[in-house]
Amino acid sequence: MLQASKQWQWISCAKKNRLLLDLNEDMQLCTPYKLRQLTDSTFKNPYFSLEDAAFYEQVYQYLVQFKLWNPAQLCQISLNATAVKFQLKPVLAKSWFFEQYTGSTPSTEAVINLTSKAQSGEFLIVEHSSDASVCINLSENFQLDDNLSLVQFEAIRVLNNRVHPLLNQHIHSKIA
């Protein structure tokens, strides 16, 4: 696991129109988040905070138990989740893209499935409220409909009745 450092900084890159995380002299993480999506605090306080570090490590440790991703992927997922949690403005719910979950088993995990008309894919819940959840796309590309798609780690808010707890069965079949 890449250990969080007080030297890490969030960078608002106008050239790429993206939020970057400067990890050291040789390494930067380029997120899919555009500058217009960022909170004002991103521009005022660019340092990776203790709160950022704690959340990053919590997500990493949670995801490692699934045994689906290598350490580099775990870092990338965890850092993008941290960016969404602390650096992004609130996103509006876009539940109409997803099928409603009609099963009786509630989701108890933060790694979930969402199903659009075009496909089904894995997402990570970054923030959860009683009505809706902010999720990041874990697939390389997720097709919402014929015209729109989400790139990897792009955030979307969905009503909780769209959350499918199918990954538990999927994970156990991959591990077995």
UniProtKB/Swiss-Prot annotation:
Q: Report keywords, A-Z.
A: Cell cycle, Cell division, Cytoplasm, Septation
Q: Where in the cell is it found?
A: Cytoplasm
- UniProt GO BP: division septum assembly; FtsZ-dependent cytokinesis
One term under GO cellular component: cytoplasm
- Residue stretches in coiled coil: none
Enumerate the HAMAP family for this protein: ZapC (MF_00906)
The entry describes its oligomerization and partners as:
Interacts directly with FtsZ.
- In UniProt terms, what function does this protein have? Contributes to the efficiency of the cell division process by stabilizing the polymeric form of the cell division protein FtsZ. Acts by promoting interactions between FtsZ protofilaments and suppressing the GTPase activity of FtsZ.
Which family would the database say this protein is a member of? Belongs to the ZapC family.
What name appears for this protein in its UniProt entry?
Answer: Cell division protein ZapC
Name the encoding gene, please.
zapC
